[in-house]
């Protein structure tokens, strides 16, 4: 079946509110119509209000880069999914390898966050991916499959069909070393196969699977030609308006 592609820029810990506003103003008038592709930017928490306001009345969607799994309480430094929904966010990125690595987030944490995100009417973009050591040992499919199964545990079929999974091999994030087209296709298909095993083929045919890891305007077309790649989660190439817009040229 035909799945609408989704291109999401992950700014990580970059841009102040003024820079975020300038970026959004530079891109919104040049975006393709959202019948062809969904386009989002994941802004740092300090930029979300500005980014959401600047993107209002455009096809650009806004994602948070993380949230907690409780709506309120004594959780100093955390971000409430309920407040994100109240602010007008659309997506929340969870499970990024940088969160797993630097902040010791577990599969259980990510599963709780996914449930909290859905409970507040938002859509999770759930990241998964293996280290170079795991990849070279031939264990990537098993490792990533376990991440996906754990993240989706207890969700409904309808919820899983509507979310986004982002396969990002850790060895390709910000390294300039990107997966081959064949690797991206085989791993995104493996992610979809896990969904099929856990929730059925109909759900697997609907869920969107992104590839991420040193995606840029020069290589996005080859990834988007893969039957099981439904978009990209993009870091460095999403920081400048021109390169971000160039990522969308595959639509034409």
Swiss-Prot record:
Keyword Acetylation in record: no
Reactions it catalyzes: D-glyceraldehyde 3-phosphate = dihydroxyacetone phosphate
One GO CC annotation: cytosol
Family the entry assigns: Belongs to the triosephosphate isomerase family.
Keyword Isomerase: yes
Entry GO MF terms: triose-phosphate isomerase activity
Pathway connected to this protein: Carbohydrate biosynthesis; gluconeogenesis; Carbohydrate degradation; glycolysis; D-glyceraldehyde 3-phosphate from glycerone phosphate: step 1/1
Keywords of this entry: Cytoplasm, Gluconeogenesis, Glycolysis, Isomerase
Active site: 96, 168
UniProt subcellular location: Cytoplasm
Protein name (record): Triosephosphate isomerase
Organism: Streptococcus equi subsp. zooepidemicus (strain MGCS10565)
A Pfam short name: TIM
HAMAP family: TIM_B
Origin superkingdom: Bacteria
């Amino acid at each position: 079946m035909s799945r609408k592609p989704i291109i999401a820029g992950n700014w990580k810990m970059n841009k102040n509110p003024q820079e975020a506003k300038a970026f959004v103003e530079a891109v919104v008038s040049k975006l393709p119509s959202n019948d062809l592709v969904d386009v989002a930017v994941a802004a740092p928490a300090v930029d979300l209000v500005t980014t959401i306001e600047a993107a209002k009345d455009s096809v650009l969607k806004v994602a948070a880069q993380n949230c907690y799994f409780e709506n309120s309480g004594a959780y100093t430094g955390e971000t409430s999914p309920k407040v994100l929904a109240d602010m007008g966010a659309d997506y929340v990125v969870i499970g990024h390898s940088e969160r797993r690595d630097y902040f010791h987030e577990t599969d259980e944490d990510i599963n709780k966050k996914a449930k909290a995100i859905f409970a507040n009417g938002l859509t999770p973009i759930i990241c998964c991916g293996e280290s170079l050591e795991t990849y070279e040992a031939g264990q990537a499919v098993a490792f990533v499959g376990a991440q996906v199964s754990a993240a989706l545990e207890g969700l409904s079929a309808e919820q899983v069909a509507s979310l986004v999974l982002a396969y990002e091999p850790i060895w390709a994030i910000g390294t300039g070393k990107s997966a081959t087209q064949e690797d991206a296709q085989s791993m995104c298909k493996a992610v979809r196969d896990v969904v099929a095993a856990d929730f059925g083929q109909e759900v697997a045919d609907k869920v969107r699977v992104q590839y991420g890891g040193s995606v840029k305007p020069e290589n996005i077309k080859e990834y988007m030609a893969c039957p099981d790649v439904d978009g990209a989660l993009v870091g460095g190439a999403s920081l400048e308006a021109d390169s971000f817009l160039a990522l969308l040229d595959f639509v034409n």
